[in-house]
């Protein structure tokens, strides 16, 4: 499990793992449990990250499908663009191997989706900062180097396939109206069971939600409005999926100029505190 941002966005890696340890940089062994199987084996994960970080373009084009389950990666890419999980582009993901005896290919699983559909995980001020707005960039291709290289090099027409897959999923699982109906169904269950009222009474104005009032009906309206605006954005000229610009022009030897805070959110260059640039951490404090 990618529990923190340390090395989990694949911009750099060090072969310094210890198979007797439960953690390695931002990664945490979950299955098999380290208490049941010790030593564990970080080599498969290390080899995959090292491949993303250090392979030349031709090797990456030729072999990336041997290291990663690309159809699953593509679906997760689209999933992130639709619901905008600002805490999940590298962090809060499970990496797993199907059967190491047959293939080292990694797949992924989703984890911890509290900071999605216009929500922010720490309930700060403002409650809905710009980076969770529906009409702003998620930054998938700039955040996780694996997606950056897939898109930049347009591996096996990755960009065209991403667009086609989005249009396909938009008819079913990621259809705007179906998503709204799903949230409505969950709300109805909470309301009819009395759970919504109990939760509102228990947690309204609590510090865990930033001293805000908890109102499920208002939250449902906010999510429905957010989804409507998000799909408008995804079909606009600024869309990170539907675009005629297929090749991101970038010298692979040059670092990404975008700067992120520890939450993976884009920040300005003069941001004070812990910043991540090109996968490396920098601490800036006021003089």
Task: Label the predicted regions.
Residues 17-45:
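Long, well-ordered, tryptophan-enriched scaffold segments
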Residues 274-287:
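C-terminal tail/sorting-segment detector
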Residues 1-26:
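Conserved ATP-binding subdomain of kinase catalytic cores across diverse folds
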Residues 111, 263, 277-280:
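Short strand-coil-strand connectors
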Residues 39-90, 96-98, 102-243:
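Middle-to-C-terminal accessory/interaction subdomains
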Residues 239-263:
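Residue-level detector of functionally pivotal "anchor" positions at catalytic/ligand-binding pockets or at interdomain
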Residues 266-269:
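C-terminal trimerization/auto-chaperone modules of long, extracellular attachment fibers and adhesins
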